[in-house]
Amino acid sequence: MNTEVLGVIAQIVLMVVLSYPLGKYIAKVYKGEKTWSDFMKPVERVMFKLSGINPNEEMNWKQFLRALLVVNLFWFLWGMVLLVTQGVLPLNPDGNVGQTAHQAFNTCISFMVNCNLQHYSGESGLTYFTQLFVIMLFQFITAATGMAAMAGIMKALAAKTTQTIGNFWNYLVLSCTRVLLPLSLVVGFILIVQGTPMGFDGKMKVTTMEGATQYVSQGPTAAIVPIKQLGTNGGGDFGVNSSHPLVNPTYFANMVECWSILIIPMAMAFAFGFYLKRKKLGYSIYGVMLFAYLVGVCINVSQEMGGNPRIDEMGIAQDNGAMEGKEIRLGSAATALWSITTTVTSNGSVNGMHDSTMPLSGMMEMLNMQINTWFGGVGVGWMNYFTFIIIAVFISGLMVGRTPEFLGHKVEAREMKIASIVALLHPFIILVGTALAAYLFVHAPAFVESEGGWLNNPGYHGLSEMLYEYTSCAANNGSGFEGLGDNTWFWNYSCGIVLILGRFVPIVGQVAIAGILAKKKFIPESAGTLQTDTVTFGVMTFAVIFIVAALSFFPVHALSTIAEHLSL
């Protein structure tokens, strides 16, 4: 037990210590300053020349968003065509067939929004070709999209008064070549050394210790895993994701993969402070996020290491904690840490089954995604926090009777309306989706049965499974309570719609707020200016997030996770 706790502490310390220099480096990359990765410039110039893009051409916020949305539409069409026709494409040694239209729609939307909602099993649902040229490609470019959007916001906020927020294409390419690719190469090399396979052979026939024959899937796993972790996408080429011994073969590999989930989202908070030359503000944001993360880690580790009271009643020892749905080689504490790390970001990868975690652990996993602000996905997590900064600044200004300001720009009704829509959309689509699914389950049993019945665990846990699915979609997370039968017409299309709304409406709103603020006349700081880099304002922002985001979900948790906990 003590060793498991020490492993958790070591991983968190590594994340915190290494995120600071990475954040400093990322800020330099986006500011165009000299860095060790400048050797990539010739490669970038070739990419821009072939694409006909001038990376030095400035864009206003509307042009920036137009480029972002148009290229995402192209990626969606690209992915749909390849997923439906993958059965006749090369690199398919196992003969996997093409996906149905509704499954391809869900898969393509999921990975296009940097999510990994997988209503299929990676070994049989995709080929090596689509793993590389749809899934892995999307894991790079959609992560880079979020980072590019944040870079544009940072440029807008750093300027006193400006009409432009940088070049989307430049930020997109820099995010891939200077951040995601180098880190992926390092992590991939470590995983190969640890035993993760890398190749294009088909299933390997093996004889088990019992003498039975088994076929083990392989593939370019060591290439896919690093970016799925670093890009906070999480989509695995195996159905059980990082629970699989070929994906996550050792405890050290598990530490590296868990570290990879959070290192860039943590670094982005520091990058903001360095970019704007307001390090105290970066520290304040980082501190609030880290506090919320550590609270979740403590709760889940204690819940999972404490065991299941129902098993205690049977007189069965639980020296290793609640081990249902967990890997012996990793243990309950490492699984609990991962469950919080993957949900506090938009990663969604798992090294154990969330459906089998204790009810309060499941509640914490969902609350992380329902709040969707603590670190979050690469780039977009900080942007969600930015939304609540605007709301907190506005409320604070009203409380003291002054015009709200943030970084020298007035926060007025237009920005507040956009921030309110973004903040309220998230609970709205989660709760409406869950209510619709619950209504159909109760009042349209024939329809539900025609789709396979949906729930293996009706009751409190069944409601939790449906709530988790829509929560995961809205947060672009992708993990799930896998007792839900979700590869159906209803779940594929309804989840796809929630995925789109949960990704693009916030990005559009947040970039618009930054662009509008940037055009306003700069107001120099004075004695009456609200200081946003203090502990007091950090607490204020935390309170606003808790009241607006978290409290919206406690009624439904009372009917699901909390009720299940009290029934144990």
Predicted features by range, described:
Residues 1-568:
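Membrane-proximal intracellular helices of multi-pass ion channels
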